[in-house]
From Swiss-Prot:
UniProt similarity note: Belongs to the universal ribosomal protein uS13 family.
Name under which the protein is recorded: Small ribosomal subunit protein uS13
Protein origin, superkingdom: Bacteria
Biased composition (Basic residues): 108-123
MF terms in GO: rRNA binding; structural constituent of ribosome; tRNA binding
Organism: Leuconostoc citreum (strain KM20)
Length: 123
């Protein structure tokens, strides 16, 4: 099992898909990493040689990407910063409402949670 950036990649997936299991690496970044490391995108994770694994690890380190815990911490601190300065986005985060301008009159149930009953209102 290939272990890159502290994450065990799924053995049966293609390496380009397996890399996206690392928080902070999407499709485009995975393709760039593999191109720079000189590894084919079609290789399965289980079929990687030790040299290929090392090349991928070295490329990930060389690109200075923020991954996993560091990136999660940065996003969390950015949201806290928005809340502290009481920007519009920070207030929306604090209230648990959509942040990017979506309408909330009818939908937004994912962000707002289950509908709350209103006392005295009958159908």
């Amino acid at each position: 099992m290939a272990r890159i950036a502290g994450i065990d990649l799924p053995r049966d997936k293609r390496i380009v898909i397996g890399l996206t299991y690392i928080y902070g690496i999407g499709n485009t970044t995975a393709q760039k990493i593999l191109a720079e490391a000189g590894v084919s995108e079609d290789v399965r994770v289980r079929d990687l040689s030790a040299d290929q694994e090392d090349a991928i690890r070295a490329t990930v380190d060389k690109l200075n990407l923020q991954l996993e815990g560091d990136l999660r911490r940065k996003v969390s601190l950015d949201i806290k910063s928005l809340q502290e300065i009481a920007s519009y986005r920070g207030i929306r985060h604090r209230k648990g409402l959509p942040v990017r301008g979506q309408n909330t009159k009818n939908n937004a149930r994912t962000r707002k949670g289950p509908a709350k009953a209103i006392a005295g209102k009958k159908k």
